[in-house]
Amino acid sequence: MTGRSRWRYHFPSEDYSSCQGVQLDEGVLIWNKLPDKFAYIKSLVFTSNCQDGTPLYSSFVELEDECPYLPIVAFDWNSYINNDGYTGPFKYSIYSVIYSVTANFIITVFLTVIVFINVPTKPSRKASYILKLGALLASLNLSIFVIRVWKNIAENYTYNGYVSSTSFLNLLWGDKVFAGIDLVVVFLLQISQVQIVMRFFDRMQEKRMVFYFGLFLILVTQILWVIPTLSPVPTKDSDSDIDILPPFVYLFRIALSTCYASVICFHVLTKKSLCFRGRMIFLTLLTIFTVFLHPTFFIVDVSNLWIDDLSEIFNTTCYLASTVIVLEWTNRIHTMERKIHAASVLGRPIYEDEEQNFHFAIYALRMQNAMKMHRDGHVHDHGHTCDSNDNANVSLQNANTNDSSSIITDNSSQRTSTFGTMATDQVTLHTQQGERNITQFKRAETFWNKCHHVLESIVYYTDNVMVNALAGSKTFDSFTNDAEKLLKTERLRKTVGLDEPEDVYLYRKTTMSSDSVME
């Protein structure tokens, strides 16, 4: 029988006399394979049907016309099925194992179908490709394993007339392909859980920190877990250095699942006005149940040996359920929040780190120019009234200062070029009536420019920090001074912003009245 990790508790094995052989006295042996179907035997050693030192017989009700068991065999069989040990009672039989594995397989396939056929509304977010791949691999892995189990059970029952739960456990524990695919599935589902936790935070810096920290913990857990899983099983008399690794990693997995459940429950408490409203009550309770099912299952796995035997199958289903159901719950909560933000006056909160490539500022300036164009066209349609008002404003501005004429000419010239500005995606000059915006936008750098900047930084710090610290700065006196001067000049131009002359700078001019200053 394939053994598990030695850190778990194992019930002491009992010795059954019927499995070791029973000396029978002389008598008549009736056997179908004998020439005359029966024979007179003076002495015979009878060995019962046993596997791994435990008897194997049918638990069905015996018929009255059947031959009874030998007294020693009947005694061993009754003591085996009635003791409180491991694999003896009916709950450890093959029937309970088959029912549990089949139900677990159906739940996994059901969750996989939900992942693929669920079409969320537009504000929601569909399942990621990582979650889809993990769910698909989990279903395929369990499907192949269940088919192998059914085939093995059918063959054993056909040729032997009995089926033992130990044969199923040997097939589960000895299948390295199943264990390897299961590790990949758990890794993908844990990545999906990290993505769900990232959605609970609004700032990009917080999301980035959650992703890096979660990915680090997942990699450490999977690397430590794969070592004892794929390593040879130690024997009873041998000592191994990796015996301490499985319990440590198992406790680490319990801690990770508990942290995930704590984050979900904290988010439920912060959004309790949305979580416990109408149809969301049932989904919220189901979410809490699934996230707490995983740490509870881990704890029960340590204390219950029957769950310990099937832990690799149950763990995958728990990971998948705590990911798929929480994702659906998160989508609905975010949909309700966006509806509330859309109905409010201020909308949703916007943070500084969301302003990447100045999308909000560019959008605001374009909308401002569009409104100004619409207003100018409306004024032009009204005819002489608007023209007289503009002429009056021009005369007042000419009387106040000499610079106002340049402002008006600039405004008129830029009104004619606004259509060209809106047609291109480049950031150009945006103006308002009577003022200018002081804005400078950074242009998105190409990939090769970023690589060039990284290479320049590496060369700079290598030359000036590492090499000078080891060999001294006088070692590089043989190089030409012109190249160093050009390099310093280029850095200075980059520091003050002169390396990008095509960037547009907008300045704001205001007119001041001398009367207001004197007052």
Swiss-Prot record:
Residues 118-126, 198-209, 265-279, 331-519 are cytoplasmic. The keyword Transmembrane applies. Its main location: membrane. Residues 1-96, 148-176, 231-243, 301-309 are extracellular. It is a multi-pass membrane protein. One of its GO terms (biological process) is cellular response to pH. The keyword Cell membrane applies. GO terms for cellular component: plasma membrane. The chain crosses the membrane at residues 97-117, 127-147, 177-197, 210-230, 244-264, 280-300, 310-330. Keywords: Cell membrane, Membrane, Transmembrane, Transmembrane helix. Pfam families: PalH. Required for the proteolytic cleavage of the transcription factor RIM101 in response to alkaline ambient pH. Belongs to the palH/RIM21 family. This is pH-response regulator protein palH/RIM21. It comes from Kluyveromyces lactis (strain ATCC 8585 / CBS 2359 / DSM 70799 / NBRC 1267 / NRRL Y-1140 / WM37) (Yeast). The gene is RIM21.
